[in-house]
């Protein structure tokens, strides 16, 4: 989820202008009657629509697994004769729509692989699973043209560009040539039979050469002057600007003299347990459990919040009609709330609201208020993606996300670089130099090398993926050399084991594979993939320690442990970090056993749709009371484990209703975009955060709650 490579921001901000024309040139329409005719149930069929003013396919499946087959092999149109899959959609519910576009291939030569999903579930590929899919979101109760660029079937990019009213789109799976598609399914959600039941109107499906034109503007805006959703009421919704100012001022006054508990040291460590202080954070195992040790020597468990900074912006191009008010470019009062990024306008209602509350001195007031609120809620760490100026000024321990992890001009698969090239080494040296400004700061807990490598989203055999194209690379050359040494220069043995007819090892350079030539080839590719990952990790780890010997290497914040390859890096980190979404932390004991290192959770959250926003985030609960219980359950069950030394909640501020840069619009904040804390959540956070050391040492029993499983609304 989360804020993946920041360099993607501008590309994702480029909202694609879309719309519908009756049947212009370059549009191949699907047969909607044929699609509808595949279904016998009464919940799916063609009906007259008041929204689209024509017959549409009405979809309200009786269970969450039923999908709409929009194309099967032999149908028209042809996937290779267009650039975009476009479908017109309207979701009737008062929460975001979730659609999964699933592309299937012929699996007759299928090789089974293990897959671990971001929510922590383990599954396996089988012949009934899509080969590649894209999970997409749409705003509720708005006609939307959903656009999927067919170029993304190569699986090299995870996040599709947004179009108006279309939210985030995330690709998962393996590359697929258009001519190999045998079936395409649209699967709608969320669904659980009681609280959530998907209900949609599907007006058209087509393959197009170019992006369609926009819909006409709506007559009634859906977002008010404060950035709030107009069409829904909820407890705590602000009436107007005066209400917002009054509540913010009352909160600031209530917490102006707050501090940490007396048994906490200046860094937030626990005075009741002391080790040797070194002036910087470090790790220690006391014979029973792992600890961080703060610079003064006190035992320290990191309980933090990600994305602490005064921002919650999103792009508005092509969606101006959704807003009751937008600050204009050049408006001096709200200049800091409006950004022009390469011609695309982004608006931040959170900053606009802080300007309304505090005037032009809003930033210094925000710094003071936020520091006090963090201490009031008993957070002792400023988490990833946060404003570093705020972190250093607040004198609260912080973690540092390093920028610009080394890449190369040639990418082997997604963002995996050519690790055997000298270019990778030189870029790693430049990457490490940014630590020079932080190496003497005792408040820095440590640094993350990067966040959620895209090559690690799902199970992928990296060496095999290199051979999807004839692209030359130093790593491919090294693989061929390695293979020749492994088989002692005997190409006949390779030909027999791989089912090939190569004349020599060098001719492997010109080979491409859509499928594994044999099980032995699969194993050989995987064996070399472990070498690739070792190089990927070792080279930057060698360089950062040359610049900064004082601080901990906190790892790469893997999105989840999608394959065995990710364990290989653990020995180079001081702390092994993963992002773990669930009602409890993901399994961590095996990580500690295999890496010999303690574990830190870089991100987790739980969200609901009972208040300000129409999506829950990666883990959903029914309401704010259950968000509170879920936080307590996650943190206390986590710190009861001897290997966990830190957990950071994602994130400080709610995301904007209209979607951040990539389209996420989740109710996951500690505070709203009007800077009002969620009382149920913050009270629970305060209670649990004060107990972490007693829970970790077994003095009190960890809080436990039976939280009902709820479909997550995320994309």
Model region roles, listed by residue range:
Residues 295, 305-306, 313, 319-360, ...:
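Polysaccharide-binding and catalytic clefts of secreted carbohydrate-active enzymes
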Residues 60-172, 195-198:
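Extracellular ligand-binding interfaces
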Residues 46-67:
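Short carbohydrate-recognition loop motifs
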Residues 236-392, 409-440, 513-518, 523-532:
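Active-site-adjacent substrate/metal-binding segments within catalytic domains
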Residues 442-446, 450-452, 604, 618-670, ...:
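Substrate-binding cleft of secreted/luminal carbohydrate-active enzymes
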Residues 463-478, 650-715:
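Aromatic-rich peripheral "rim/lid" segments of glycoside hydrolase catalytic domains that contact
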Residues 346-354, 409-417, 511-526, 559, ...:
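Active-site clefts of carbohydrate-active enzymes
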Residues 527-617, 632-636:
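Glycoside hydrolase catalytic-domain groove-lining segments
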């Amino acid at each position: 989820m989360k804020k993946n490579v920041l360099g993607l921001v501008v590309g994702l901000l480029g909202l694609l202008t879309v719309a519908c024309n009756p049947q212009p040139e370059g549009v191949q329409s699907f047969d909607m009657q044929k699609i509808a005719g595949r279904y016998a149930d009464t919940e799916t069929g063609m009906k007259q629509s008041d929204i689209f003013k024509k017959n549409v396919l009405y979809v309200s499946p009786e269970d969450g697994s039923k999908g709409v087959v929009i194309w099967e092999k032999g149908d028209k149109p042809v996937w290779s004769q267009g650039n975009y899959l476009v479908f017109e959609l309207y979701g009737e519910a008062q929460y975001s729509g979730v659609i999964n576009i699933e592309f299937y291939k012929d699996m007759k030569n299928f090789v089974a692989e293990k897959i671990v999903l971001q929510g922590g579930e383990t599954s396996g590929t089988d012949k009934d699973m899509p080969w590649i899919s894209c999970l997409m979101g749409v705003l509720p109760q708005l006609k939307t043209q959903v656009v999927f660029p067919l170029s993304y079937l190569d699986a090299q990019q995870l996040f599709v560009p947004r179009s108006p009213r279309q939210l985030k789109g995330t690709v998962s799976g393996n590359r697929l040539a258009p001519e190999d598609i045998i079936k395409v399914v649209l699967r709608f959600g969320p669904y659980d039979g009681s609280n959530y039941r998907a209900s949609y109107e599907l007006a058209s499906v087509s393959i197009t050469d170019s992006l369609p034109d926009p819909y006409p503007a709506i007559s009634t805006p859906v977002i008010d002057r404060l950035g709030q959703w107009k069409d829904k009421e909820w407890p705590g919704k602000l009436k107007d600007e005066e209400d917002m100012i009054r509540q913010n001022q009352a909160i600031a006054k209530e917490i102006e003299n707050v501090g940490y508990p007396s048994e906490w040291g200046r860094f937030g460590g626990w005075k009741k347990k002391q080790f040797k202080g070194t002036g910087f954070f470090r790790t220690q195992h006391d014979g029973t459990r792992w600890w961080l040790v703060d610079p003064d020597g006190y035992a320290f468990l990191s309980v933090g919040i990600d994305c602490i900074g005064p921002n919650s912006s999103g792009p508005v191009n092509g969606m101006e009609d959704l807003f009751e008010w937008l600050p204009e470019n050049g408006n001096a009062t709200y200049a800091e709330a409006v950004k022009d990024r390469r011609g695309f306008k982004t608006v931040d209602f959170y900053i606009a609201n802080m300007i309304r509350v505090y005037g032009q001195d809003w930033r210094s007031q925000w710094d003071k208020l936020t520091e006090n609120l963090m201490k009031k809620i008993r957070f002792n760490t400023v988490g990833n993606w946060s404003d570093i100026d705020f972190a250093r000024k607040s004198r609260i321990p912080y973690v540092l996300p390093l920028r610009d992890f080394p890449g190369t001009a040639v990418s082997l698969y997604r963002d995996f670089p050519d690790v055997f090239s000298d270019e990778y080494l030189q870029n790693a040296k430049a990457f490490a130099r940014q630590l020079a400004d932080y190496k003497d700061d005792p408040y820095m807990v440590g640094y993350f090398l990067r966040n959620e490598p895209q090559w690690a989203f799902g199970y992928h055999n990296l060496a095999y993926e290199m051979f999807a194209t004839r692209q030359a690379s130093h790593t491919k050359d090294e693989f061929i050399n390695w293979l020749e040494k492994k088989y002692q220069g005997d190409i006949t043995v390779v030909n027999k084991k791989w089912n090939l007819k190569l004349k020599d090892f060098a001719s492997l350079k010109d080979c491409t594979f859509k499928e594994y030539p044999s099980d032995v080839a699969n194993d050989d590719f995987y064996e070399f993939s472990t070498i690739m990952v070792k190089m990927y990790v070792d080279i930057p780890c060698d360089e950062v320690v040359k610049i900064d010997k004082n601080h901990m290497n906190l790892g790469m914040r893997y999105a989840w442990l999608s394959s065995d390859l990710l364990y290989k890096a653990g020995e180079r980190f001081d702390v092994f970090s993963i992002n773990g979404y669930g009602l409890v932390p993901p399994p961590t004991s095996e990580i500690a056993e295999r890496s010999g290192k303690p574990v830190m959770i870089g991100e987790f959250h739980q969200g609901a749709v009972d208040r300000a926003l129409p999506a829950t985030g990666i883990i959903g609960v029914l309401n704010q009371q259950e968000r509170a219980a879920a936080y307590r359950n996650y943190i206390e069950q986590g710190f009861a484990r001897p290997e966990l030394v830190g957990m950071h909640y994602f994130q400080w501020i709610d995301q904007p209703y209209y979607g951040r840069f990539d389209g996420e619009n989740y109710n996951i904040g500690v505070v709203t975009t009007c800077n009002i804390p969620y009382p149920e959540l913050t009270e629970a956070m305060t209670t649990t955060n004060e107990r972490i050391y007693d829970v970790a040492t077994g003095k009190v029993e960890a809080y436990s709650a039976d939280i009902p499983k709820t479909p997550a609304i995320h994309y």
